[in-house]
């Protein structure tokens, strides 16, 4: 288990669901500082790029996450319509740059083709089933989404219900959600069905 540093802002829940030709990223609005709620309506999910064709959500230290989002936007300008390449290049920088190496954040990013998680360890991970969650309530949201994915629900409904469950369990997650949706290609599992 990671060491809890009281001077760093922790906790949030971010989930992504790709289903039925849609991809959704949802996040809560709570910003915590140690054991204190500092803000309840933060916007941790946003559109990136000039055309808004990439959506991203972040968990971890807020200032660090904004730094990484800015860097990702720069990479997306260098590699337009190549989200995987932009994320891999960002991950390389994140691991090798002395300043970036200390940033404590994770991100979920998606475009119409792919969903990825980026970690401070330099990982760029793609979920095999189109669902992924990060943050202190991530495991609660992920479990809920997996339970709901086979039901006749769309991606946004699954994400919203999963976030509701995480908000009821995780003290670092509230029920003020920001949700962004894109039209998407079918996931590999959906194509196989």
From Swiss-Prot:
Compartment list: Cytoplasm
Enzyme Commission number(s) from the entry: 3.4.25.2
Key words, A-Z: Allosteric enzyme, Cytoplasm, Hydrolase, Metal-binding, Protease, Sodium, Threonine protease
Protein name as it appears in the record: ATP-dependent protease subunit HslV
Database matches in SUPFAM superfamilies: N-terminal nucleophile aminohydrolases (Ntn hydrolases)
This protein's encoding gene: hslV
InterPro entries: ATP-dep_Prtase_HsIV_su, Ntn_hydrolases_N, Proteasome_sua/b, Proteasome_suB-type
Active site location: 12
Job of this protein: Protease subunit of a proteasome-like degradation complex believed to be a general protein degrading machinery.
Gene3D superfamilies the UniProt entry points to: Glutamine Phosphoribosylpyrophosphate, subunit 1, domain 1
Family: Belongs to the peptidase T1B family. HslV subfamily.
Domain of life: Bacteria
Quaternary organization: A double ring-shaped homohexamer of HslV is capped on each side by a ring-shaped HslU homohexamer. The assembly of the HslU/HslV complex is dependent on binding of ATP.
NCBIfam families associated with the record: ATP_dep_HslV (TIGR03692), PRK05456.1 (NF003964)
Activity regulation note: Allosterically activated by HslU binding.
GO molecular function: metal ion binding; threonine-type endopeptidase activity
Binding, Na(+): 167, 170, 173
One Pfam family named in its UniProt record: Proteasome
Catalytic activity: ATP-dependent cleavage of peptide bonds with broad specificity
Biological process according to GO: proteolysis involved in protein catabolic process
Gene Ontology CC entries for this record: HslUV protease complex; proteasome core complex
HAMAP family referenced in this protein's UniProt entry, alphabetically: HslV (MF_00248)
């Amino acid at each position: 288990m990671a060491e809890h540093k009281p001077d760093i802002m922790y906790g949030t829940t971010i989930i992504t669901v790709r289903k039925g030709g849609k991809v959704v990223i949802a996040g809560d609005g709570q910003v915590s500082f140690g054991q204190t709620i500092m803000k309840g309506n933060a916007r941790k999910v946003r559109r990136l790029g000039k055309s808004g064709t990439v959506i991203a959500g972040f968990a971890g230290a807020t200032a660090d996450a904004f730094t990484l989002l800015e860097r990702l936007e720069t990479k997306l300008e260098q590699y337009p319509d190549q989200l995987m390449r932009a994320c891999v290049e960002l991950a390389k920088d994140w691991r090798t740059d002395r300043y970036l190496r200390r940033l404590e954040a994770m991100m979920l990013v998606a475009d119409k083709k792919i969903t990825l998680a980026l970690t401070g360890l330099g990982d760029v991970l793609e979920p095999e089933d189109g669902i992924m969650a990060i943050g202190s309530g991530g495991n609660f949201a992920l479990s809920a989404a997996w339970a709901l994915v086979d039901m006749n629900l769309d991606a946004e409904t699954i994400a919203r219900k999963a976030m509701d469950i995480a908000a009821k369990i995780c003290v670092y997650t509230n029920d003020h959600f920001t949700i962004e949706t894109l039209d998407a290609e079918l996931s590999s599992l959906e194509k196989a069905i």
